[in-house]
Swiss-Prot record:
Belongs to the TRAFAC class TrmE-Era-EngA-EngB-Septin-like GTPase superfamily. EngB GTPase family. GO terms for biological process: division septum assembly. The gene is engB. Disulfide bonds: none annotated. Pfam families: MMR_HSR1. Necessary for normal cell division and for the maintenance of normal septation. GO terms for molecular function: GTP binding; metal ion binding. Residues 25-203 form the EngB-type G domain. SUPFAM superfamilies: P-loop containing nucleoside triphosphate hydrolases. InterPro entries: G_ENGB_dom, GTP-bd, GTP-bd_ribosome_bio_YsxC, P-loop_NTPase. HAMAP family: GTPase_EngB (MF_00321). The keyword Nucleotide-binding applies. Signal peptide: none annotated. This is Probable GTP-binding protein EngB.
């Protein structure tokens, strides 16, 4: 089975809105999350490039949709969506982000899956749940990345993961929503995340005859 070499990721373009996004050839997966959840660190750990997704000491500052692709797979993309939900961001900006995120999720045909990044110590905040609901309503697969797992003892981290998975089962969305623990500091969970992303980005490679129809 073909696999993407995520460590070859390169910056493609920044877009201030969905209208400035690249053309929709190929497939893409998006990363979304609260501004202090560790989204940029997760992308940088996945790609082995500490400077690929910019981190800011002022959470919520980045308002661009950032696209990355791969030299050997230019039509497959990782998308870094603006962080959301930070208390110091003006309400007008929050509302614009909410509208932009909703528009992207609902109208972007190339999108194959959504990674929602959550601090394992504070999972399933209100806007996280809203993002899950948006995706599920559109039958979009979701992967919950519980970051900063190193901040909890192993038993507590595992209990949180199990609680999140149970919440998805109780909500009857576990067929679309998966979850895992992740630590950028300890490099934990990279292979599992890669498997999820490859499954989303390269499904057509598994069924070449169907893709030609």
């Amino acid at each position: 089975m073909a696999k993407i070499h995520f460590r070859t990721a390169q910056f493609l373009i920044s877009a201030p809105s969905i209208r400035q996004c690249p053309t929709e050839e190929g497939t893409e997966v998006a990363f979304a999350g609260r501004s202090n959840a560790g989204k940029s660190s997760a992308i940088n750990t996945l790609t082995g490039n500490g400077k690929l997704a910019r981190t800011s000491k002022t959470p919520g500052r980045t308002q661009l949709i950032n696209f990355f692709n791969f030299p050997a797979a230019p039509d497959q993309r990782i998308v870094d969506l603006p962080g959301y939900g930070y208390a110091k961001v003006p309400m007008a900006v929050k509302k614009k982000w909410q509208a932009d995120l909703s528009e992207y999720l609902q109208q972007r045909d190339a999108l194959r899956g959504l990674v929602i990044v959550m601090d394992i110590r504070h999972p399933l905040q209100d806007f996280d749940t809203m993002m899950i609901n948006w995706a599920v309503e559109g039958e979009m697969p979701v992967h919950l990345l519980l970051t900063k797992a190193d901040k909890l003892k192993p038993g507590a981290a595992k209990s949180t993961l199990l609680a999140v998975q149970k919440h998805m089962r109780d909500a009857q969305v576990d067929d679309l929503v998966s979850a895992q623990m992740f630590s950028a500091l300890k490099k934990q969970g990279i292979n599992q995340l890669e498997d999820v992303l490859n499954g989303w980005l390269l499904p057509q490679h598994d069924e070449p005859e169907a893709a030609q129809e």
